[in-house]
From Swiss-Prot:
This is Large ribosomal subunit protein uL23. It comes from Corynebacterium glutamicum (strain ATCC 13032 / DSM 20300 / JCM 1318 / BCRC 11384 / CCUG 27702 / LMG 3730 / NBRC 12168 / NCIMB 10025 / NRRL B-2784 / 534). GO terms for biological process: translation. Pfam families: Ribosomal_L23 (PF00276). GO terms for cellular component: ribonucleoprotein complex; ribosome. GO terms for molecular function: rRNA binding; structural constituent of ribosome. Belongs to the universal ribosomal protein uL23 family. The lineage of its organism: Bacteria, Bacillati, Actinomycetota, Actinomycetes, Mycobacteriales. The gene is rplW.
Length: 101
């Protein structure tokens, strides 16, 4: 397992979608993460950045879409999403109301 010095290199951004808003009520938060990060690294990064306890991490690799333009075909970049479930009794993450120092 390669070590990454800064946990903010692992967590790229929160996913803003209707599904992610719905999952927040169940204490599940969705983030775009680095494609080479594993579940253990994601868990440690979330706990360090937001100061919460993580119960589980599920990841999804999404292949880039094939897009066509006038000159030919191209591909959007592939992404990786992490669905992070917090432990019972843990504080919620306030990711959409301001930045975290």
């Amino acid at each position: 397992m390669a070590t990454i010095a800064n946990p903010r290199d692992i967590i790229i951004a929160p996913v803003v979608s209707e599904k992610s808003y719905g999952l927040m009520e169940q204490n599940v938060y969705t983030f775009f993460v680095s494609t080479d990060a594993n579940k253990t690294q994601i868990k440690i990064a979330i706990e360090e950045i937001f100061g919460v306890k993580v119960a589980s991490v599920n990841t999804v690799n999404r292949a880039g879409k094939r897009k066509r333009s006038r000159t030919g075909f191209g591909t959007r970049k592939a992404t990786k999403r992490a669905y992070v479930t917090l432990r019972e009794g843990s504080d919620s993450i306030d990711i959409f109301n301001g930045s975290v120092a």
